[in-house]
Amino acid sequence: MIRALLLSTLVAGALSCGLPANLPQLPRVVGGEDARPNSWPWQVSLQYDSSGQWRHTCGGTLVDQSWVLTAAHCISSSRTYRVVLGRHSLSTNEPGSLAVKVSKLVVHQDWNSNQLSNGNDIALLKLASPVSLTDKIQLGCLPAAGTILPNNYVCYVTGWGRLQTNGASPDILQQGQLLVVDYATCSKPGWWGSTVKTNMICAGGDGIISSCNGDSGGPLNCQGANGQWQVHGIVSFGSSLGCNYYHKPSVFTRVSNYIDWINSVIANN
């Protein structure tokens, strides 16, 4: 009976993530578009203190009421961070949004900032206090360990990154549709070649829509057959030639490669 109760609780917990109360509107729009307010309620803004002013630096995903998933390259041990949750516009103090200080930074032990192409661009941030879940603040689902998405699987990248190479940064959360590019294609010489590893996901490369500066650390959202959105990627890097360069897809940390690490960090901290 206890085992059955525990199992039902775990199943209920799994179903409580990745299902926004405000469903995203998903037409394909060249260059991305404003997201529907609070339709990606696990998306957070990671901000750092700059002489008393909080500045957006990266995105992230709320994966537990006390933990945010982001990219390792977003983190500097010398900075003080906070996480802003439940926000649509970064310039407006919206009702129901929260700003919570970060109490602990856990960067993957194999991350090397001088060797970005080795991967392991993943970090977890512990919040100073757990957050309550609402329609505006929800958990992102993680995929099953080892999951590999097929070529051309439809996903959406979200964030407050630049609208184009060297362009302006938006106040409003943006979304853009990206198609997954499988490893066999993305690792071809005319694409990313040996820069891309199997612990990464490529998506995009059409020369139109991509992630850009300021999106780093944010989620690649992919919908499962049951309607739940899962966070399959963490924005890691793009081409130095520009954000929307043809045959240079956005590259993401493949979350399904790090499920054991994520669970271990949360359980032991």
UniProtKB/Swiss-Prot annotation:
As given in the record, the signal peptide range reads: 1-16
Q: Which CDD domains match?
A: Tryp_SPc
A GO CC term assigned to this protein in UniProt: extracellular region
What are the TM regions of this chain, as residue ranges?
none
Domain of life here? Eukaryota
Record localization? Secreted
In Gene Ontology terms, what is one molecular function of this protein? serine-type endopeptidase activity
Tell me if Secreted is a UniProt keyword of this record.
Answer: yes
- Tissue specificity remark: Pancreas.
Q: Which residues form the Peptidase S1 domain?
A: 29-267
Disulfide links within the chain: C58-C74, C155-C222, C186-C202, C212-C243
Q: Which UniProt keywords apply?
A: Disulfide bond, Hydrolase, Protease, Secreted, Serine protease, Signal, Zymogen
The protein's matches in Pfam families, at most eight in alphabetical order, are given as: Trypsin
Query: Which GO biological process annotations does it have?
Result: insulin catabolic process; proteolysis; regulation of insulin secretion; regulation of platelet aggregation; response to insulin
Which EC class heads this enzyme's classification? Answer: hydrolase
Q: State the Gene3D superfamilies in the record.
A: Trypsin-like serine proteases
Q: Which residues form the propeptide?
A: 17-28
Where are the catalytic residues? H73 (charge relay system), D121 (charge relay system), S216 (charge relay system)
Q: Recorded E.C. number(s)?
A: 3.4.21.71
Catalytic reactions of this protein: Preferential cleavage: Leu-|-Xaa, Met-|-Xaa and Phe-|-Xaa. Hydrolyzes elastin
Q: How does it assemble?
A: Interacts with CPA1. Interacts with SERPINA1.
Which family is this protein grouped under? Belongs to the peptidase S1 family. Elastase subfamily.
Name the PANTHER family on file: CHYMOTRYPSIN-LIKE ELASTASE FAMILY MEMBER, CHYMOTRYPSIN-LIKE ELASTASE FAMILY MEMBER 2B
Physiological role:
Elastase that enhances insulin signaling and might have a physiologic role in cellular glucose metabolism. Circulates in plasma and reduces platelet hyperactivation, triggers both insulin secretion and degradation, and increases insulin sensitivity.
Protein name according to UniProt: Chymotrypsin-like elastase family member 2A
Q: What organism is recorded for this protein?
A: Sus scrofa (Pig)
